[in-house]
Swiss-Prot record:
Its EC number is 2.5.1.6. This is S-adenosylmethionine synthase. GO terms for cellular component: cytoplasm. ATP binds at residues 16, 174-176, 241-242, 250, 256-257, 273, 277. Belongs to the AdoMet synthase family. Catalyzes the formation of S-adenosylmethionine (AdoMet) from methionine and ATP. The overall synthetic reaction is composed of two sequential steps, AdoMet formation and the subsequent tripolyphosphate hydrolysis which occurs prior to release of AdoMet from the enzyme. Homotetramer; dimer of dimers. Pathway: Amino-acid biosynthesis; S-adenosyl-L-methionine biosynthesis; S-adenosyl-L-methionine from L-methionine: step 1/1. The gene is metK. It comes from Levilactobacillus brevis (strain ATCC 367 / BCRC 12310 / CIP 105137 / JCM 1170 / LMG 11437 / NCIMB 947 / NCTC 947) (Lactobacillus brevis). One of its GO terms (molecular function) is methionine adenosyltransferase activity. SUPFAM superfamilies: S-adenosylmethionine synthetase.
Amino acid sequence: MQERHLFTSESVSEGHPDKIADQISDAILDALLAQDPDSRVACETSVTTGLVLVFGEISTKAYVDIQKVVRQTIKEIGYTDGQYGFDGDNCAVLVAIDEQSPDIAQGVDDSLETREGDADPLDQIGAGDQGLMFGYAVNETPELMPLPIELSHALMRRIAMLRKQAVLDYLRPDAKAEVTVEYDDNDQPLRVDTVVLSTQHDPDVTLDRIRQDVIEQVIKPTIPADLLDDQTKYFINPTGRFVIGGPQGDAGLTGRKIIVDTYGGAARHGGGAFSGKDATKVDRSASYAARYIAKNIVAAELAQKCEVQIAYAIGVAEPVSVYVNTFGTGTVAEAKLATAVRDLFDLRPAGIIQMLDLKRPIYKQTAAYGHFGRTDIDLPWEHTDKVDALKAACK
């Protein structure tokens, strides 16, 4: 049992420079998968004032106008005005793409198991790299996500909506939110202690108006009233001015918001980013599978909280380890859960791709506001269709 404590998570808007990069990388990935579902993609993006650089390794039968995809993505985010120091019509776009290394491809196309004579087609694809991936679920929200990251994402979605609908017409695309939640001694959320929200804005709006609008039109409609009280602290644009933002204010790079993308720091992270990678990259696909497993375990009420680790060797199909941790909240032994997971979930890369239908162009929509706990889009790793099977396996 813990004492009362505070825990904080953050989110960033789709106009944050790192998130611009993530969305461009995933928009390119989706465009390639739409033409060639077997595309091998490792697409990185960097953005700065007036410049986008797209680079990486891609092997595909598809043809995609990368410049067009980049510019369209930037404009959809809201960078449509040269005053922002970055806009989709006028920025330079440089492309430096190579093919996937044949040394890597030989281990992905023909796994160690296949080379040793295994005829199972799901054993053919080896992991695209070594690595460890985590998935997590907790019963403190309906989405089975930690509350601080859920609230942070919700604030960012709300402020983007108000900007795009011109309700607050002085808003610009870059923004960040951070929410601190107080937990009781049973590790259940009690209240929101602090909300930090910084939003880019036009130069002529006053700080007082921004603060009033953010509290009344962003925070209060988003965070349930029973979580806010007279002691809740609000820090709105605490530097006093946020006119220069986006890539003009900070360079952005694919894969630099891995905690925003996942659980807001409430769970461990293996270090691998998601965006711009096709599903043979287990950094992405195995993280989705681990979330799928953890969410189904918690949804089955086999634990209140669950973290799953999966690890791989490059070029080998079967994971080298699968670990289930329920933090003392499980109703069955963790070893029994791990056995059930191995039996019910095919964690070979080809098995994950088949189980979650990952060759589709579904990735750009995940590149802002988190890859997990989403209710606004249908993501297969958020389904709880393994609950009955897990319950039966753990009797």
